[in-house]
Amino acid sequence: GKAIAAKIKELVETGALKFFDDLRAEFPADILELFSLPGLGAKKIKALHEKLQVSSIAQLHEACVAGRVAELPGFGKTTQEKLCRAIDERQKYAGSFQYGQIAAEAERLQDDLRAHSEALHVCIAGSYRRRKEIVRDLDFIVATSAPAEISAMFVQHPLVESVIAQGPTKSSVRLRSGIQCDLRVVSAAEYPFALNYFTGSKEHNVEVRSRALKRGWTLNEYRLGEARPDSAAKQKKAAQKIPVIRDEVELYRALDLDYIPPELRENAGEFEAAANEKLPRLIEAENLRGTFHCHTTASDGRNSLEEMAAAALELGLQYLGIADHSRSSIQARGLDEARLRVQLAMIRKLNEGFENFRLFAGVECDILRDGSLDFPDAVLAELDYVVASVHSAFTLSEADMTRRIVRAMQNPHVTMLGHPTGRLLLRRDPYAVDIPAIIDAAAETGTWIEINAAPKRLDLDWRWWPLAKEKGVKCVINPDAHGIERLQELWFGVGVARKGWLTKADVMNCLPLGKIEAALGKKRSVNRDR
C-alpha cells in the first residue's frame, strides 16, 4: 500500500526510517534479548517490563533470584526456576559463537585483507581454520612488508565495532557479531611458522615442537633454529641441518611428515598417520553431487518444491531430496498421509521435466517415544528414502533413548538417521544416548548417519566419525534446509566430515545421480529382505 511504499522510498533516499527509529526509542535497547530465552514470548516480556521494570537479561536474573518473577500471574515458581537455568546456560556460553554465526564476517575480512596491495599472504588461523564447531575468537595472520598499512586497514574495516588495541605487529578489534578478532602481522619468512603455531591446537603444537627438538632444532611462532646446547644435548643425535621453510608443507616435510590438514590438528592420531603416509585424502565441497533432508512450504520450509529444485540446480547439484516433517510434528505443520501422497505425486510430475537432475521423494519421519515411526510401513514403502529423527521426549534415560533410536533404525524403510544427538549448539545439550551403540546399529542395519550441516547442529559430531568409519558406517551430509539460501550450508557439513577424517568414499551424497539411484534401490531391496 501507499504507507509501505512511502517507507521504502524514505529508506532508499535517506538510509533511515523515522517510523522504525521512533518505535525503537519506545523500548530499552536490551529488551529484545529476552526473546532468546525459552518460554518467553511477547505477552510475558510485556508483563515483566510493566510489572517488574525488567528490560534486560541481567535485570531478569536479579528478579528471579529475588523471587519476584514467581509472584507474577502466569509465571509461578516453576517458570522462574526454568528462566534461572536458561540464564545460567546462557552465561556458560558467553563469548562463544557457532562456527556458522561468524563465518560470513570471517571470510569477508579475510577476502578484504587478501585484496590489500601490501598483503603477501593472508589466512585465518585458530579454531576457525581447524573447523571447530564453537569459536571464541578469530586470528588473522598476514605476511607483509608494510605492517602499519595493514594494521590501519584492519582496525578501520566496516565490520569493526570497536578497537581493543592497535600496535605495530598485533591489533585486536571486536566485530559487529561481538567476536574478538586479532591480527598478527609478520614477515614473509615468519609466515609459515606463525600460521602453523596460531592454527594450533595446543596439543598438536606440543608434538610438532617435540619432533623438531629431536632433530636438534627449536621451533616457535617465528622461526626454526638450532636448539640451545643444553636442549640439544638431551637428544643423543647431532643437530640436523636446518632446511629452508617457505610454507607449511615444507615445515611438515622437515619433520618427516606428510602435510597435515588443519582440520586434523588435534593430536588425535594425525602424527602417526602422517609419518606412515596414511593420512586420508579428505572430502572436498566440490565432491558433493546432491543432498537429502530439505524442507518446503508443505511443512515449515520457506520455499516451494520448484524453488528448491531451481536453487539446487544453480548450485550444480544433480539431485535433491525432499523430506518434509511427518504428522506428529504439529509445530512444523507436519504432513499427514494424504498430503504426503500429494507431494509425492508433485515430485514425480516435476521429475518428468528435468534432464540430468532428480528430486527424491522422502520424509523426515518422527521417531516416536517407543521407537516406532510416525507413518506405517505401507506409506514409507512408497517413498524413495526416509530420514528418521527424534523431535520429542528428549529427557528419556540413555538406555531408553538408545533403545528408541535403535528400534527405529531396525525398520527396513529407514534410510538415514537425522541429527543423531538432537543438540543445538550453545542452546541445548545433546540428549543422553549411547553413540557407540547407535553406530553399531547403523553398521548392522546399513543405516546411513547424517551430518546435519545446519550451523546450530553440526550433528553427528566430528569426534564420533573415526569410530563410525572404522565400523563401515556411511555418512550423508544434509543441510536440513528450510529455505533456498540454506542449501549452501552444506559447506559447514563438509568441514565436520573433514574434521572426522572422512573421504568422499565415506559420504553417500558424493555419488553421482545414477549411482545414488542404484544405492537407494539396493538398500530398499536388501532391507525388504531383512
Indicate residue ranges for each PLM-predicted region:
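Short acidic-aromatic active-site loops that bind/stabilize oxyanions
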Residues: 99, 297-298
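Accessory alpha-helical DNA-binding modules that contact the DNA backbone or grooves
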Residues: 2-171, 178, 192-193, 206, ...
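Charged catalytic cores and adjacent phosphate/nucleic-acid-binding surfaces used
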Residues: 131-217, 221-296, 302-322, 327-357, ...
